[in-house]
């Protein structure tokens, strides 16, 4: 959100509604979540909906820019190979002709123009570059053994299932197992789980802390063990024509995905709409937004 809009929202004093628009469904925010909701409605043959987006273009942090030479992402820039549980993502990729053949196949074929081998990470430590995300120079045999055991256990957890038959750590997260034995991990910190399972190596705690800060914005001592393990064990998508750690991407990052979603909401996205009031009534929801300098009331 630009500072100008933020200050306008803070200052208040908006004019009374100049017009009222009615719709069956109103989606506030045209980021990936909002566009996904619109895509789902369109696929269900629901066409009476609107998307309100504050910026000049929908897409949130999946938008892209364009230089004279090449497009470039502003934020989100790759998609891991979708898991079997990610049926909606696979359906979208099939619509966009990036996933070829059966979208429910264990190892689908993907358009090679969107496939990218995972960039190999490296760490700058003590004035030297080291390959991989974990340091190995000057690490004793005991710490190296812990690193190997941790990676092996995460590979096991990628296939682990609960008593309900679901994967312990799935994407979408809501499809993960509800088995109490796995869910109990949500009640202890990730750092505590590591220590309790013999993972005391400083390099592993550094990696865990890096991971949780990157995805959740919190230290591994503030993140639940379930969430921390989900980071490492949720991705198990495969492809017939790529390694399992490959990703789907393009020069513009994830903008191609965003535009694929937005296409299904064509004509129903209201940009430059800053919502400043939401009121839930008995029969409907009333939303006031500034659009083109005037307040428009939306009723859904």
What annotation goes with each model-predicted range?
Residues 21-23, 293-300:
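Core beta-strand elements of the Rossmann-like FAD/NAD(P) dinucleotide-binding domain
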Residues 70-157:
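Dinucleotide-binding Rossmann-like beta1-alpha1 core, especially the glycine-rich loop
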Residues 287-291:
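Short beta-strand segments that buttress and anchor functional surface loops
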Residues 1-25, 43-48:
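Extreme N-terminal leader/targeting segments of oxidoreductases
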Residues 162-284:
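Active-site/ligand-binding neighborhood in enzyme catalytic cores
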Residues 42-68:
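Glycine-rich FAD pyrophosphate-binding loop
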Residues 38-39, 61-64, 90, 133-135, ...:
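Short, solvent-exposed loop/turn and secondary-structure capping segments
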Residues 29-32:
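Glycine-rich Rossmann-fold phosphate-binding loop(s) that bind the pyrophosphate
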């Amino acid at each position: 959100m630009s500072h100008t809009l933020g200050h306008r929202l803070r200052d208040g004093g908006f004019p009374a509604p100049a017009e009222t628009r009615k719709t069956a469904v109103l989606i506030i925010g045209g980021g990936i979540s909002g566009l996904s909701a619109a895509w789902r409605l369109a696929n269900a043959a629901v066409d009476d909906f609107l998307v309100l987006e504050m910026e000049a273009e929908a897409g949130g942090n999946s938008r892209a820019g364009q230089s004279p030479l090449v497009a470039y992402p502003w934020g989100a820039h790759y998609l891991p190979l979708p898991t079997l549980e990610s049926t909606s993502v696979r359906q979208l990729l099939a619509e966009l002709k990036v996933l070829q053949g059966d979208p429910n196949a264990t190892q689908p074929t993907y358009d090679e123009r969107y496939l990218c081998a995972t960039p190999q990470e490296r760490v700058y430590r003590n004035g030297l570059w080291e390959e991989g995300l974990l340091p190995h120079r000057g690490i004793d045999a005991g710490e190296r053994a812990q690193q190997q055991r941790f990676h092996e256990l995460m590979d096991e957890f990628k296939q682990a299932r609960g008593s309900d038959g679901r994967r312990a750590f799935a994407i979408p997260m809501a499809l993960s197992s509800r088995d109490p034995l796995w869910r109990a991990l949500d009640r202890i910190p990730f750092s505590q789980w590591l220590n309790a399972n013999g993972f005391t190596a400083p390099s592993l705690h550094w990696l865990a802390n890096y991971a949780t800060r990157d995805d959740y914005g919190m230290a591994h001592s503030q993140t639940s063990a379930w969430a921390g393990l989900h980071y490492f064990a949720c991705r198990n998508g495969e492809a017939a024509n790529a390694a399992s750690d490959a990703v789907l991407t393009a020069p513009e990052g994830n903008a191609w995905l965003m535009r694929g979603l937005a296409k299904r909401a064509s004509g129903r996205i209201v940009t430059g709409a800053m919502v400043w009031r939401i009121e839930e009534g008995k029969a409907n929801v009333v939303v006031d937004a500034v659009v083109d300098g005037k307040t428009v009331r939306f009723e859904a």
